[in-house]
Amino acid sequence: MFHASWCGWCHKLDSSLNHESIKDIFDKNYVTTHLTVYESKNKKEFENPGALEFLTRYKGNDIGIPYWIILDKNGKWLADSQIRPEGADYNHVGENVGCPASREEVNHFLKVLGKTSTLNGTELMAIEKKFLLKK
């Protein structure tokens, strides 16, 4: 997950992923790594070296943060936080959902999770409930 210390949506995504109702689900299915980018001038030392280049490589450098990608165990791209038109390939820049909150964004998130894990219906429903919760 690409993030910055000043990014409110980044903190919200982190809090949601670590919420007691779904943390174990994510921990069993994903390894979450934080890469810090776009820090303010007085916090540039907190940026991870090479993170911006990595973000650019995966087409996320101009569409906002948080931005997340899912790679397989060999580092092959599987999915990311961009909603693209049906049938569009990875090279088509879409709309970044960042921290999913709207119905469309949460649906995209659930679709990605369903394709990149072995999550069952109950687990996906718990994630949906947490992300659609307005608190």
Residue ranges of predicted features:
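C-terminal partner/receptor-binding element of secreted or periplasmic proteins
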Residues: V106-K135
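Conserved redox-active cysteine motifs that mediate thiol-disulfide chemistry
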Residues: F2-L17
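Generic hydrophobic, helix-prone segments enriched in Leu/Val/Ile
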Residues: L13, L55, D62, L124-E128
